[in-house]
Amino acid sequence: MMQHYLQTKEEYKDCILFYRLGDFYEMFFEDAKTVSKELELTLTGKSCGLEERAPMCGVPFHAADGYINRLVKKGYKVAICEQVEDPKLAKGIVKREVIRVVTPGTNIDMQSLDEAKNNYLMCIVYIGDKYGIATTDVTTGDFFVTEVDSERKLLDELNRFSPTEIICNEPFYMSGVDIDDMKERMGIAVSALDSWYFGDDLAKETLLSHFHVQSLEGLGLMDYDCGVIASAALLKYLYETQKNTLSNILELRPYSIGKYMIIDSSSRRNLELVETMREKQKRGSLLWVLDKTKTAMGARLLRSYVEQPLIDKTEILKRQELITNLNDQEITREELREYLGPIYDLERLITRITYQTANPRDMIAFCNSLEMLPPIKTLLEDLKGELATGIREHFDCLEDLCALLKSSINDDPPISVRDGNIIKTGYNEEVDRLRNVSICIIRASKSLADLEGKEREKTGIKNLRIKYNKVFGYYLEVTNSFKDQVPDYYVRKQTLTNAERYITPELKELEDTILGSQDRLVELEYDLFRQIRDTIADNVARIQATARAVAQIDVFVSLALVAGQNNYCKPKINESGVIDIKGGRHPVVEKMIVNDMFIDNDTYLDNHNNRISIITGPNMAGKSTYMRQSALIVLMAQIGSFVPAESANIGIVDRIFTRVGASDDLASGQSTFMVEMNEVANILRNATANSLLILDEIGRGTSTFDGLSIAWAVVEYISNPKLLGAKTLFATHYHELTELEGKLNSVNNYCIAVKEKGDDIVFLRKIVKGGADKSYGIQVAKLAGIPELVINRAKDIVNQLSANDITETVKNISVEGQASGKKKKPHLDEVDLTQMSLFDTVKDDDIIQELRDVDISHMTPMDALNKLYELQNKVKNRW
């Protein structure tokens, strides 16, 4: 046995080997030490022919799933080596084989997975300058493939799918991509596979064979060279780990990244699409607001909608039409919710069925779900529109499968397939016959008691007992003190220290009656159950199509319900480039606040004179909430959802970028400012004129002059249609940036309205035209509870600093790329020289002369502020 264990372990070196021995899975040597430590199990030893005992630990086979899941969540792979023949029939050592390898991306245990989230396994192939990306969820049978031509686009797909496991070729692993970040920060198990997985010659053959097509054209893969290799490698990996035909993976869906709105990882995090930034909880996210789904399939589909909004107007309008229909038919909508509620996870149930791991109770759950389908299809007849028609066409009520299960499986069966009592009476004649024999078994059991009494009386052995174990069956046990009274017709079966065990012809006959019929009945029920399960598995394509239709209905019913409950409006979708939101509200914040009413606000952006809105105002006033709500309303509209507003006219955007807040990235050694600049650089490099940018406090992570210079230059760059020209909401504390409204045609100033009451302020949360006249920082500090002594000192200091404001100097900065009429060159006597010092005037003639020589009309904003910074340092150094 140990020799076979070592041979098997050699084949699965990278796995923890669960080796079945009787009623336990045992681990040996280093595996035992690892499992003992990770799962806090007792480490024992076993004699294995070596000088020292082999370290060993084990878990009961009936509880193994829980232990396996804990190991997989810690990043381990687990190979399950099972007994594949009946130990009673084995000649010599019981035959064992690895029946499955469980990895983070191939785990199909429904108890350990989040039912509302897909469990994706991704394969990445890097060849030349392209990345092939194949992604599957083995629990649902979904299989996608695409290609991208940059690392940034690859990371966008990575963030969109959020896989739990990545397999890749060696060139990708060594390409410089931050593998450690994927493993540690993102929690993804990443491994490079041997080169044979990625052979070009076998790739095409693998795909054609699995999907039963004659050419790659039949799969839509003509232009996916890297994608073909990635898809084939992923299938090979699944064959190796799952040890089955993968009959639940029936369709490969190529897609172009241009089909969906692009949202990078930072923006997903900042907008809190599916989880909150700090707590990583669903509550408080956009998904939390929208998700009123009743099924696991619907919850997963809605999540995918939120993570990949559409950019195709026609597809968006199809979704809108169905939501409108469901809104208008409230009774139909509520009846659909009633019938959707009892439906189990059909996608994952059919995978368990095809993997032959579904138990009798899974089959009853499946049957109960199928009973809900006919009334749902009847209700679908009331819905109009192209999308509703398409759903109806793919909606199969599966009555034949439901009838099979109702006639064959007991309503309350055991979990184990080996416990019997699975098959209904009347389904199979032989089962019925053997069940009738069971009545005789009960009588036979009474006969055992009768036989025991009769033998005691006949032999005079008062402590004679009839007992049973799996090895010897039924036997008569007599203690040594009475063995001299044993009659000749007793046949000895076993000698113990203090007793003898015997068999008689009459007892043997009873044993055959009892055990033979029970074993035959259990075995027959097991065989029939497998046949029924296989019949269901043969219909996997029908079941998956219906499961997807159910998921779609669930999603649109949910979106319609949310729209009605929250007074959302139907947005107008177009390609005009205009975003015009009246009375917009933040979908999450309005649900979270309890005592206050949410203040709505308007947003207007276009591709001409209203391209950039510069928003000023104090902290806590609501700038970030306003900008996020605008982005979320656009995103919701492109999901197809209704939106929280009085009205909305949404010109489709291809990307949403946000740069909202930052913190030090200590793990990678990056400061707050470096994190901020990396995000800004990504936006400026990858945004287009059709993108929506949400920028909050650009430049705050460095000195005032540097920060203002960068913020100014960024606004200039974005506003220039030849460079970018994207629609932008730009919040800032640099009030000097409001000067750009008069210098750049596409820039407009807005601020958060504030009401002053003496030294106190009230945030009105309303966006109004114009720039803020001051920041109210001291008032905000007072609201936050800063000690009064500090507040009073701050007032003194701000009064001194206000005399040395740089605003007047900023007014005279030229704007890059503007007509000469926009530039202003001040006379020397117009310049307030006190601005060059924070607390006193400047009397140094050489500095004044240097200032006279500066030609402001030929300086960029960055040059001007750098010069100002240089002169200020000279003054400081002389004090």
Question: Each predicted region: which residue ranges?
Answer:
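Charged catalytic and DNA/RNA-contacting regions of genome-maintenance
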Residues: 1-325, 341, 345-354, 358-450, ...
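ATPase nucleotide-binding head domains, primarily ABC-like/P-loop NTPase cores
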Residues: 29-32, 224, 294, 305, ...
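Extended active-site and interfacial segments that coordinate phosphate-rich ligands
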Residues: 32-51, 136-163, 484-515, 595-605, ...
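Active-site phosphate-binding and catalytic loops of NTP-dependent enzymes
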Residues: 81, 104-113, 245, 384-387, ...
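Amphipathic heptad-repeat alpha-helical coiled-coil/stalk segments that mediate oligomerization
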Residues: 198-206, 213, 261-262, 368-443, ...
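Hydrophobic alpha-helical segments characteristic of transmembrane helices
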Residues: 337-340, 346, 364-367, 543-552, ...
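Alpha-helical heptad-repeat coiled-coil segments that mediate oligomerization/polymerization in large
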Residues: 528, 532-539
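C-terminal tails and terminal domains of large nucleic-acid-associated
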Residues: 837, 841-879
